[in-house]
């Protein structure tokens, strides 16, 4: 999923990756795709683990596709002067953002909805962002062709079964 892509792109960019995942199986998958560390957030708060791994400094950037409680925990182990990027709500709960933590730590929250750049929003800005998106996609395809991005395919569906596949 998007977490695997985030791990692999982070490694390409030279980051030390601490993956927080929801199962032991996902811990193994995260490590197989390049995570330096993996913590199962279902086993309890992961703040202490992240702080231990970072020598008490906290994470320098956080990418969160889960939301809810995971986002709240992430804010508690983020370093000052960095960004946290919520990209979804896979956990089912939309995160609430406590402004006091943002203020005290000088943290920036940066949302990302890729659909905005592809015309899937109220305002169609495809033409404006087309050169940037083409450049980004060309870079991603080059990484894929070089074997640096390795999507995890667990099942293949016919195009006619698109809605069934998306429900999984």
Segments the model singles out, each with a brief description of its role:
Residues 1-44:
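Mid-domain Rossmann-like dinucleotide-binding core that forms the NAD(H)/NADP(H) cofactor-binding site
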Residues 10, 30, 62, 74, ...:
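Terminal peptide-recognition signature
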Residues 21, 69-146:
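Glycine-rich phosphate-binding loop and adjacent beta-alpha segment
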Residues 35, 58-59, 102, 149, ...:
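Local beta-strand N-terminus motif with an aromatic residue
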Residues 39, 60-63, 85:
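N-terminal Rossmann-like NAD(P) cofactor-binding module of classical short-chain dehydrogenase/reductase
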Residues 45-56:
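Short amphipathic alpha-helix with an adjacent loop that forms part of the alpha/beta core around
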Residues 141, 146-156, 163-168:
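C-terminal capping/lid region of NAD(P)-dependent oxidoreductase domains
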